[in-house]
Every structure is written in C-alpha cells, then in structure tokens.
Amino acid sequence: MKGCIFNIDAGYLEGLCRGFKCGILKQSDYLNLVQCETLEDLKLHLQGTDYGTFLANEPSPLSVSTIDDKLREKLVIEFQHLRNHSVEPLSTFLDFITYSYMIDNIILLITGTLHQRPISELIPKCHPLGSFEQMEAIHVAATPAELYNAVLVDTPLAPFFVDCISEQDLDEMNIEIIRNTLYKAYLEAFYDFCKQIGGTTADVMCEILAFEADRRAIIITINSFGTELSKDDRAKLYPRCGKLNPDGLAALARADDYEQVKAVAEYYAEYSALFEGAGNNVGDKTLEDKFFEHEVNLNVHAFLQQFHFGVFYSYLKLKEQECRNIVWISECVAQKHRAKIDNYIPIF
C-alpha cells in the first residue's frame, strides 16, 4: 500500500532516477578509459557510453577543464529536471541536497574576496546547483554579521548561520569555522527532515548522513592539529547526528594526534576498517580515498530498496564520484603521468 501511495507523486521520478543510474560507467568502461593515449581518444570512448555526444561541439584540442565543465553541466541538467517535476515533500528533499553547494559557493566567494579576486572571476567557479540571487553582493561583507545581514538573511541558509554571527573580521581561520558550523547545522537539519519523512527514506538517508557527519568530525579533528583552534572550539564544530555521537565525539575532542583519532575509530567497526587500510606511503590508499569508497558503497546500497527518496541523493553522489574519476583519468592522460592513472574509485 505504501508503495502505491509513494508512486502517485514520486514513482515516475524514482523510475527515471534508476534509469539514469543504469548509465553510470562500469569497470569495463574504466578499463577502456585508462588505455587512452590522448583526450581525443577519451572523448571517443565516452561517446560509446550514456555520455554520448556531450563533447561533440567542443573544439580541439580538448582541455581537462572543458571535460570537467561539461560533466558538471550534464549532471546539473539531470538533477534540475528531477527537481522541476517534483512535488512536496520530495521537492524540499531535493532542495536540501542543493544547500551543501550553496555553502561551498559562499565559502569560495568569501575566500576569493579575501584574496582580492574580482567577483566576476569567482562567480563562474561556483557550482550551479548552489547559485542564489544575492551571491554577487558577498564582497561587501567584512564580518560574519555583515555577511548574514547583507547576503544570507533571505536565503535557505539563514537558519544554519545563526551560530556563526559575530563581529570578528573574516580571515582564513574564521572562514573555515564558518564553513564547518554551516555544515554542522545543515547536516543536522537534513537528518531531522529525513527522520520526519520516516519509512525507508529515513532508514537509508540517516545511515548516509550519519557517515557524512562522522567523516566531517574525523577530518576536522585531523586538520586541526598544529593550528590555533582550541579543543573546545573544535568540539563545537562536530555534527551531532552520526554514530560517533556522543562518546566518540567526546573522545575526538580530546585527541592530540592522528594515532589517537585512529584509536577512537577502533571502537566503531566500519570506521576501524577504513583506518586499517589507509596510509601515506607509495601504493597506499589515503584516508580520504577510503572514505570515498565507503560513501560509494552506502550510495550503491541505497538502490537495493524501493519507494524512498534516498535514490535521488545517492545518484547525485555516485555521479559526482564518476565525474571525479573521469577528471582524474583525464589529468593523467593529459600530463602523460600514467603511474597513478588507476587511482580512481570504481562504482560498479
């Protein structure tokens, strides 16, 4: 019965999304791509996939940045098509997905402005899914309070910004604190919204968002070593909707080095496994790569269940990983640096 009700409003879009997912590159496609000698070869191989002629109008010689832009453009068109045909509560769910891109755009613009880069040069670098009308006014803000009052007060990010408002000048450290505070509030709000929807959507999305929250807490901790950020301030940046909450986060807040972070992870089976295989030696996978691999697994598993919104989130994340893979391979081909060309993260 629940499936019938779900299908009234969201069944067509879920089916469409699953159709899009069938076009994600397989391992056999990657084996062809890594054998390419030039970007023109790569373009030719991509024509035999669901990407088709997306590079057909691009003049030679192709650049990696052009490939990156066209990959993003194709993904944005697909996502916006889903958003334009959605109704509540799916439309709000899809809007929530775009808020993370809005946060990234704001941080990019503030950082660029801090380094005296013209706003006209920064706007094209912003992600289209996170664009909003007030973006071009961001250069007038010198403090977080001004940023809120001049730019963010009328955007969906306003509720997330409440804990960031201060009269301190915007510098590198404050910008990072703002980024992480916004993400904390965003993840917690998205998690609560998914729980409110309930059912399979809550089961799938809360698992994915809990991992995202824990990943951010671990990375914030590791990146804070050797900086001026105090342990108390660091603890305030941890999202509280992950599996590490509360004991794991309390232990992370006390950590003084990487080994202590690893010791915290050992109490959580899925995170312990990620640290076990990670390293910075030649041939080792980085912790970041291990996190990406785990994220891919969670998002692939989202498609094993039906009648839920998680497939929309997971499709976007899997396609983003695919775009990173293609850009990585393109960079290696363009620079004739084939030693690390296999360091992409396979999806299927």
From Swiss-Prot:
The keyword Oxidoreductase does not apply. PANTHER family: VACUOLAR ATP SYNTHASE SUBUNIT AC39 (PTHR11028). GO terms for cellular component: proton-transporting V-type ATPase, V0 domain. Keywords: Hydrogen ion transport, Ion transport, Transport. It holds the Pfam family vATP-synt_AC39. This is V-type proton ATPase subunit d. Belongs to the V-ATPase V0D/AC39 subunit family. Subunit of the V0 complex of vacuolar(H+)-ATPase (V-ATPase), a multisubunit enzyme composed of a peripheral complex (V1) that hydrolyzes ATP and a membrane integral complex (V0) that translocates protons. V-ATPase is responsible for acidifying a variety of intracellular compartments in eukaryotic cells, thus providing most of the energy required for transport processes in the vacuolar system. May play a role in coupling of proton transport and ATP hydrolysis. InterPro entries: ATPase_csu/dsu_sf (IPR036079), ATPase_V0-cplx_csu/dsu (IPR002843), ATPase_V0-cplx_dsu (IPR016727), V-type_ATPase_csu/dsu (IPR035067), V-type_ATPase_csu/dsu_dom_3 (IPR044911). V-ATPase is a heteromultimeric enzyme made up of two complexes: the ATP-hydrolytic V1 complex and the proton translocation V0 complex. The V1 complex consists of three catalytic AB heterodimers that form a heterohexamer, three peripheral stalks each consisting of EG heterodimers, one central rotor including subunits D and F, and the regulatory subunits C and H. The proton translocation complex V0 consists of the proton transport subunit a, a ring of proteolipid subunits c9c'', rotary subunit d, subunits e and f, and the accessory subunits VhaAC45 and ATP6AP2. One of its GO terms (molecular function) is proton-transporting ATPase activity, rotational mechanism. The keyword Cytoplasm does not apply.
